[in-house]
Amino acid sequence: MIIGTFILDFQTIDFEPDAKIAVDMLSDYQRLYQLENSFALDPPVQSLGWSFAKMFLAGRFVEKIYAHQAFKIEASKGKKLEDKFVAWLQKELKNRGCSAQIKIAPEMKSI
């Protein structure tokens, strides 16, 4: 399975704590799978009390996570792998207290 880079929209009304939860969780997975520089969260743009940022996940990173979490990811909502992965990631973040909403960015859909 070859997966390209995931480009996600990260939207929240409380950027700093939500971003910290997301970065900490992804850093833990990155360490677990012995990878480096496998994700990025851009600085946010503020609008009407919301913060909007782009999150990038390297394809290899997504593949490693999927290999170890396939059962949970496959049980998530969605028809395509990308949708299931994002639904799983959203749930994992929520379980850790992150209130951000994530979704596949239009830039990823057009690739």
List the predicted regions and their residue ranges.
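A structural detector for beta-sheet-dominated domains
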Residues: 9-11, 56-58, 103-105
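Residue-level signal for secondary-structure boundary sites
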Residues: 16, 63-65, 110
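Extended Gly/Ser/Thr-rich low-complexity repeat segments
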Residues: 21-28, 64-88
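Conserved short beta-strand edge segments in small beta-sheet-based binding/regulatory domains
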Residues: 73-110
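Broad gene-expression machinery/nucleic-acid interaction feature
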Residues: 3-7, 52, 99-103
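Short, intrinsically disordered low-complexity segments
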Residues: 33-79
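Short, extreme N-terminal segment that most often corresponds to the first beta-strand
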Residues: 1-26
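Short secondary-structure junctions
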Residues: 29-39, 94-98
